Amino acid sequence: MSEARPRHIPVLGPEAVTLLAPRDGGIYLDGTFGAGGYSRLILEAAATRVIAIDRDRSAIAGGFDLVQGAGGRLTLVEDRFSNLAEVCAAQGAPAVDGVVMDIGVSSMQVDQADRGFSFRQDGPLDMRMGTDGPTAADVVARASETDLANIIYIFGEEKFSRHVARAVIAARKEAPITTTKALADIVASVVRAKPGQIHPATRTFQALRIFVNEELDELYQALAAAERVLKPGGRLAVVTFHSLEDRIVKTFLAERSRVGGGSRHLPELAQAAPSFTVLTKRPTTAGDAEVAANPRARSAKLRGGERTAAPAHRPDDLPGWPTLAGVMKAGVTRAGR
C-alpha cells in the first residue's frame, strides 16, 4: 500500500491493532479516522477491509491519498461514530470483526488555530468537530452563570468552576468573548497554576469542547453501537485521554462482562448474559519512549473487549456516566440534535 500523505503514528496504535488482531478477509471499523493512523495499521496488518468514520470533513478530505493507496480496501464516511451501526449497514457490512476508537480531539485539530480547540494559539472560539451546532463562543455568550459553572465542573472537573463562570459573565458584559486567547486570559485571571502544572485554561477548554460536541453521550452511544455490530469473537479497542472518557469505557466493559443472576424469589433481577469478555484487566498505557516522542500519550489508556455470542444489552443499561440532564443551554440547543 502506498500513499503521499505523511505517515501518522497514532497514540498506542500498535498496541490497539495487536488487541484487534486483524485477520485476512476481516472487516474493521475505525470510528475516529482523524489522520488515518489506525486505519493504515489495520490495512497493513492483514488483507482486511476498513470502514472509517469521522465527523470532521477536513479529516475525510485529507484521507484521499490513503484511500487511493489502499486498493479499494478503505472506505471513508463523514458521520458521527455514534451512527456506526447505520454506517456499517449502508456499506454492506452489518457485522464486523473489530472496532477501534480514539476518543477526543485529534492533534491535527488542535494544531489548526482556526478550529478554536487550543488556548496555546489564538483563533476563533469554535471547538466544533463538525460544522453543525453551536460553537463554544455561543455557549460562553448565552449560558447562565450556574449552567456555565456546572458545565466546567462536570465536564472539566475544574474545582474553580464557579470562579471561572463568574469571571466569564463579568467579562462578556464588557465585550463578546469570541477568541481562544480572550477566554484563556479570563480563566488565567482566576485560576492560578504553579510551575510545572497544566495551563490554567486546560480544564475549562476541555469542558466546553466536550459539551459542544456532546462527546460523552456520543462515546456511550458508539460503544453500544459497537456492541450491536461486532460478530462473536470480534474485538473492541478504545483509546481515551482523560478520566471521564476512561470511566465510561471501563464501566461499559464491566457491565457488559458481568455474570450474575436472580434468585428463585427475585428472578427479575437476573443479569443479562455477558456480551463482552474484558481483554484488558488494567488499561494499557504508553511507554516512556512514546511519551517522549508525543507528550499527549502520557494520559492515554487503551481498554478492550471481545464480543461473546450473547445478544446486545439494552443501550440504556449503563448507569452513572456523566450527563447534564438538568442543564439547558439558555437558548443554545445541543449540537446537531
Curated annotation (Swiss-Prot):
Assigned EC number: 2.1.1.199
Record protein name field: Ribosomal RNA small subunit methyltransferase H
GO biological process: rRNA base methylation
A GO CC term attached to the entry: cytoplasm
Domain of life: Bacteria
Major localisation: cytoplasm
Places the protein is found: Cytoplasm
Region: Disordered, residue numbers: 295-323
Gene3D superfamilies (alphabetical): Putative methyltransferase TM0872, insert domain, Vaccinia Virus protein VP39
Reactions catalysed: cytidine(1402) in 16S rRNA + S-adenosyl-L-methionine = N(4)-methylcytidine(1402) in 16S rRNA + S-adenosyl-L-homocysteine + H(+)
GO MF terms held by the record: rRNA (cytosine-N4-)-methyltransferase activity
Task performed by this protein: Specifically methylates the N4 position of cytidine in position 1402 (C1402) of 16S rRNA.
Family: Belongs to the methyltransferase superfamily. RsmH family.
Residues reported to bind S-adenosyl-L-methionine: 36-38, 54, 81, 102, 109
Keywords noted in UniProt: Cytoplasm, Methyltransferase, rRNA processing, S-adenosyl-L-methionine, Transferase
Keyword tRNA processing: no
Top EC class, one word: transferase
InterPro entries (UniProt xref): RsmH, SAM-dep_MeTrfase_MraW_recog, SAM-dependent_MTases_sf
